[in-house]
Amino acid sequence: MRVEKRALKDISRLQRSDQRRIVDFLENRLARRDNPRELGEALTGPLAGLWKYRVGSFRILTRIDDSALAIWVVQVGDRREVYR
Protein backbone atom coordinates (compact mmCIF):
# COMPACT_ATOMS: atom_id res chain seq x y z
CA MET A 1 0.00 0.00 0.00
CA ARG A 2 1.23 3.45 -0.87
CA VAL A 3 0.02 6.76 0.49
CA GLU A 4 0.29 9.90 -1.62
CA LYS A 5 1.58 13.13 -0.07
CA ARG A 6 -1.85 14.73 -0.21
CA ALA A 7 -3.38 11.86 1.77
CA LEU A 8 -0.59 12.06 4.37
CA LYS A 9 -1.32 15.76 4.75
CA ASP A 10 -5.05 15.03 5.08
CA ILE A 11 -4.40 12.45 7.79
CA SER A 12 -1.99 14.74 9.68
CA ARG A 13 -4.74 17.37 9.99
CA LEU A 14 -7.08 15.01 11.83
CA GLN A 15 -7.35 14.46 15.56
CA ARG A 16 -5.06 11.73 16.92
CA SER A 17 -7.93 9.34 17.63
CA ASP A 18 -9.21 9.68 14.05
CA GLN A 19 -5.69 9.24 12.69
CA ARG A 20 -5.37 5.97 14.63
CA ARG A 21 -8.73 4.70 13.35
CA ILE A 22 -7.80 5.40 9.75
CA VAL A 23 -4.28 3.96 9.98
CA ASP A 24 -5.65 0.90 11.78
CA PHE A 25 -8.20 0.39 9.00
CA LEU A 26 -5.56 0.75 6.29
CA GLU A 27 -2.99 -1.53 7.93
CA ASN A 28 -5.15 -4.16 9.58
CA ARG A 29 -8.19 -4.45 7.35
CA LEU A 30 -7.50 -3.15 3.87
CA ALA A 31 -3.85 -4.16 3.37
CA ARG A 32 -4.51 -7.72 4.52
CA ARG A 33 -7.34 -8.37 2.06
CA ASP A 34 -6.84 -10.55 -0.98
CA ASN A 35 -9.56 -8.53 -2.70
CA PRO A 36 -9.64 -4.95 -1.32
CA ARG A 37 -12.74 -4.20 -3.39
CA GLU A 38 -14.86 -6.29 -0.99
CA LEU A 39 -14.74 -3.54 1.62
CA GLY A 40 -15.14 -0.55 -0.67
CA GLU A 41 -17.38 0.95 -3.27
CA ALA A 42 -16.45 2.14 -6.76
CA LEU A 43 -16.99 5.82 -7.45
CA THR A 44 -18.65 7.14 -10.59
CA GLY A 45 -18.72 10.38 -12.53
CA PRO A 46 -15.67 12.62 -12.31
CA LEU A 47 -14.12 10.34 -9.67
CA ALA A 48 -14.57 7.14 -11.70
CA GLY A 49 -11.63 4.80 -11.24
CA LEU A 50 -11.35 5.53 -7.53
CA TRP A 51 -12.66 3.42 -4.67
CA LYS A 52 -14.03 4.73 -1.39
CA TYR A 53 -13.85 3.19 2.05
CA ARG A 54 -15.89 4.35 5.03
CA VAL A 55 -14.31 4.81 8.46
CA GLY A 56 -16.87 6.55 10.66
CA SER A 57 -17.67 9.91 9.07
CA PHE A 58 -14.42 9.82 7.09
CA ARG A 59 -13.83 8.56 3.58
CA ILE A 60 -10.63 7.12 2.21
CA LEU A 61 -10.27 7.44 -1.56
CA THR A 62 -7.95 4.96 -3.24
CA ARG A 63 -6.78 3.89 -6.66
CA ILE A 64 -6.29 0.13 -7.02
CA ASP A 65 -3.60 -0.95 -9.48
CA ASP A 66 -4.07 -4.63 -10.29
CA SER A 67 -1.00 -4.84 -12.53
CA ALA A 68 1.29 -3.69 -9.71
CA LEU A 69 -0.80 -5.29 -6.95
CA ALA A 70 -0.85 -1.92 -5.20
CA ILE A 71 -3.38 0.26 -3.45
CA TRP A 72 -2.73 3.99 -3.66
CA VAL A 73 -4.35 6.08 -0.93
CA VAL A 74 -5.22 9.29 -2.76
CA GLN A 75 -7.24 11.36 -0.29
CA VAL A 76 -8.69 11.17 3.22
CA GLY A 77 -11.35 13.47 4.60
CA ASP A 78 -14.75 14.03 6.10
CA ARG A 79 -17.55 12.73 3.91
CA ARG A 80 -18.90 16.26 3.40
CA GLU A 81 -15.63 17.52 1.91
CA VAL A 82 -13.70 14.64 0.36
CA TYR A 83 -15.61 14.49 -2.93
CA ARG A 84 -15.07 18.15 -3.85
Protein language model features and the residues they cover:
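Enriched for short, Lys/Arg-rich terminal
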Residues: 2-9, 13, 20, 24, ...
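A short, surface-exposed loop/turn module that caps and links secondary-structure elements
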Residues: 28-52
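A short, compositionally biased N-terminal segment around positions ~18-40 that is enriched
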Residues: 17-33
